[in-house]
Curated annotation (Swiss-Prot):
<comment type="subunit">
    <text>Monomer. Component of the KEOPS complex that consists of Kae1, Bud32, Cgi121 and Pcc1; the whole complex dimerizes.</text>
</comment>
<dbReference type="GO" id="GO:0000408">
    <property type="term" value="C:EKC/KEOPS complex"/>
</dbReference>
<dbReference type="InterPro" id="IPR017861">
    <property type="entry name" value="KAE1/TsaD"/>
</dbReference>
<feature type="binding site">
    <location>
        <position position="177"/>
    </location>
    <ligand>
        <name>substrate</name>
    </ligand>
</feature>
<dbReference type="GO" id="GO:0005737">
    <property type="term" value="C:cytoplasm"/>
</dbReference>
<feature type="binding site">
    <location>
        <position position="111"/>
    </location>
    <ligand>
        <name>Fe cation</name>
    </ligand>
</feature>
<dbReference type="Pfam" id="PF00814">
    <property type="entry name" value="TsaD"/>
</dbReference>
<feature type="binding site">
    <location>
        <position position="128"/>
    </location>
    <ligand>
        <name>Fe cation</name>
    </ligand>
</feature>
<keyword id="KW-0819">tRNA processing</keyword>
<comment type="function">
    <text>Required for the formation of a threonylcarbamoyl group on adenosine at position 37 (t(6)A37) in tRNAs that read codons beginning with adenine. Is a component of the KEOPS complex that is probably involved in the transfer of the threonylcarbamoyl moiety of threonylcarbamoyl-AMP (TC-AMP) to the N6 group of A37. Kae1 likely plays a direct catalytic role in this reaction, but requires other protein(s) of the complex to fulfill this activity.</text>
</comment>
<dbReference type="GO" id="GO:0061711">
    <property type="term" value="F:N(6)-L-threonylcarbamoyladenine synthase activity"/>
</dbReference>
<comment type="similarity">
    <text>Belongs to the KAE1 / TsaD family.</text>
</comment>
<keyword id="KW-0963">Cytoplasm</keyword>
<dbReference type="InterPro" id="IPR034680">
    <property type="entry name" value="Kae1_archaea_euk"/>
</dbReference>
<feature type="binding site">
    <location>
        <position position="107"/>
    </location>
    <ligand>
        <name>Fe cation</name>
    </ligand>
</feature>
<protein>
    <recommendedName>
        <fullName>tRNA N6-adenosine threonylcarbamoyltransferase</fullName>
        <ecNumber>2.3.1.234</ecNumber>
    </recommendedName>
</protein>
<dbReference type="GO" id="GO:0002949">
    <property type="term" value="P:tRNA threonylcarbamoyladenosine modification"/>
</dbReference>
């Protein structure tokens, strides 16, 4: 089966075709704001300008390879409403034109599914961290249950917020990681874990204040160590509670090598396995939407046109995972 997937929840517009074995074609066009963070309407305008040429290129690539597309998948949510609507409209038109099933995919679950596909993880506790989300999840009773999540802003949002406050370019995460490697000391910062949930807004504020008094490299290091320790603690608790012997890191912030190191060490100490997808599959990508659409279609799940409205606040635990 060949499925075309379209991702466009925020920054990255991407389209891909996959089958059960591999990614066949993938193309992307990324929105980069002139300054500051993401502007939803500007991002949607970017997507609307690029989605036609992007899809034509992917479809022509399929024709050149003699591939017949069996389904169209799209990111139905969560995400920025204007961006989601642009992608959903294109997906509906394409599914009708090709006369193939349409399937709306939960963006968060797509990160998990492509991670499992590409690493071989079977039943992991999942730390999902990105610019818009920070959650610890595990599959129980046919749904990806949220064991812990942010009480305010995501860890990716927190890193970008701090970066802007100290004049670092967007996206802030990679630059913070780079500066942290040259640190000489740890500066105590607020560590906020409440039960199974975490909070990052106070940490960002405290780090911005610390940057006025300490070397920026030390503040970046301390910010990373504190935030990531919070995430690792909750992931370990979820593994114990859900009795999982595997952990997997997904989402754009998961590309941070230090976070991967901390999770790997925790898993080694627990005698558990740690899985980390290739960097190309950590950020938002069309392949994850296409692959999740494929497993959904093979399990008998599709989305009627009349039910294909976008869901900006689509919760991970709302989805019945029939294919797992």
């Amino acid at each position: 089966m060949y499925v075309l997937g379209i991702e466009g929840t925020a920054w990255n517009l991407s389209a891909a075709i996959v089958n059960e074995d591999d990614v066949i074609i993938e193309r992307a066009a990324t929105y980069t704001p002139a300054r500051g963070g993401i502007h939803p309407r500007e991002a949607a305008q970017h997507h609307s300008e690029h989605i036609g040429p992007l899809l034509r290129e992917v479809i022509q690539g399929a024709r050149d390879l003699g591939i017949k597309i069996d389904g169209v998948a799209f990111s139905q949510g969560p995400g920025l409403g204007p961006c989601l609507r642009t992608v959903a409209t294109a997906a509906r038109v394409l599914a009708l034109k090709l006369n193939v099933p349409l399937v709306g995919v939960n963006h968060c679950i797509a990160h998990i599914e492509i991670g499992k596909w590409k690493t071989g993880a079977r039943d992991p506790a999942v730390l999902y961290v990105s610019g818009g989300n920070s959650q610890v999840l595990a599959l129980r009773r046919g749904r990806y249950r949220i064991f812990g999540e942010t009480l305010d802003i995501s860890v990716g949002n927190m890193l970008d917020k701090f970066a802007r406050s100290v004049g670092l370019p967007h996206p802030g995460g990679p630059r913070i990681e780079e500066l942290a490697r040259n640190a000489k000391e740890y500066i105590p910062l607020p560590y906020t874990v409440k039960g199974m949930d975490f909070s990052f807004s106070g940490l960002a504020t405290a780090a911005a204040e610390a940057a006025r008094r300490y070397d920026l490299e030390d503040v970046c290091y301390s910010l990373q160590e504190t935030a990531f320790a919070m995430l690792v603690e909750v992931t370990e608790r979820a593994m114990a509670h859900a009795e999982k012997k595997e952990a997997m890191l997904v989402g754009g912030v998961g590309a941070n090598r230090r976070l991967g190191e901390m999770l790997r060490l925790m898993c080694e100490e627990r005698g558990a396995r740690f899985y980390l997808p290739e960097r190309r599959f950590m950020g938002d990508n069309g392949s994850m939407i296409a692959y999740t659409g494929l497993v959904m279609l093979k399990s008998g799940v599709s989305t009627p046109i009349e039910s294909s409205g976008v869901r900006p606040n689509y919760r991970t635990d709302e989805v019945e995972v029939r294919w797992a």
